[in-house]
């Protein structure tokens, strides 16, 4: 599928929201991509992950890992497409870690996934976990890179959509200046 088709998919599932949003990164934005609204449809999740899997089918990935909650479905379906394991990391006392008996064996080839990448904060936390376990990171994958390709993660990044959606520091946000109420739609508590 092309970029326009993916954008239309977000619109058709009411996953492209407009307003005033507090992102997990702590930044503000006039647009929010709620991937869960797309991924709630198994046929769309399968289609998205099939397209992503094409980039990694010859990489012999051993495990796909992403942060809970946003990347759990993405990690699972992408791992199914790549015929490998899927695990996720989650926060415990504010720190991202592997729980539930999940582990990465030394030398395993790992694909890190996230649904939407803005600053790469959650992805960087996952990368650190993989390094702790001495896994070999092959790449980072996602549905949307909303940084416009500006986020640097130190590994190849492959997303289906690269959008340049403006974000603002809270003290520089024009939406705050206009008095527009802010909404926090994500899954991570912002400090």
UniProtKB/Swiss-Prot annotation:
The keyword Signal does not apply. Its cofactor is Mg(2+). GO terms for molecular function: magnesium ion binding; orotate phosphoribosyltransferase activity. Pathway: Pyrimidine metabolism; UMP biosynthesis via de novo pathway; UMP from orotate: step 1/2. It is an enzyme of class 2 (transferase). It comes from the Bacteria. Catalyzes the transfer of a ribosyl phosphate group from 5-phosphoribose 1-diphosphate to orotate, leading to the formation of orotidine monophosphate (OMP). HAMAP family: PyrE (MF_01208). This is Orotate phosphoribosyltransferase. It comes from Caldicellulosiruptor saccharolyticus (strain ATCC 43494 / DSM 8903 / Tp8T 6331).
């Amino acid at each position: 599928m092309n970029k326009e088709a993916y954008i239309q998919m977000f619109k058709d599932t009411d996953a492209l929201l407009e307003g005033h949003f507090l992102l997990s990164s702590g930044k503000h934005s006039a647009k929010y991509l709620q991937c869960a609204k797309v991924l709630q449809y198994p046929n769309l999740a399968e289609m998205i992950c099939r397209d992503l899997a094409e980039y990694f089918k010859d990489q012999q990935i051993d495990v796909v890992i992403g942060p809970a909650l946003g990347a759990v479905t993405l990690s699972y379906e992408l791992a199914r497409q790549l015929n490998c394991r899927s695990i996720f990391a989650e926060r415990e006392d504010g720190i991202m870690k592997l729980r539930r008996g999940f582990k990465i064996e030394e030398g395993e080839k790992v694909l890190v996934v996230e649904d939407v990448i803005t600053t790469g904060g959650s992805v960087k936390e996952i990368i650190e976990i993989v390094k702790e376990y001495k896994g070999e990171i092959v790449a980072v994958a996602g549905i949307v890179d909303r940084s416009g390709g500006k986020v640097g993660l130190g590994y190849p990044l492959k997303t289906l959509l690269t959008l340049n959606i403006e974000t603002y520091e809270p003290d520089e946000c024009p939406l705050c200046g206009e008095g527009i109420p802010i909404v926090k739609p994500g899954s991570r508590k912002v400090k």
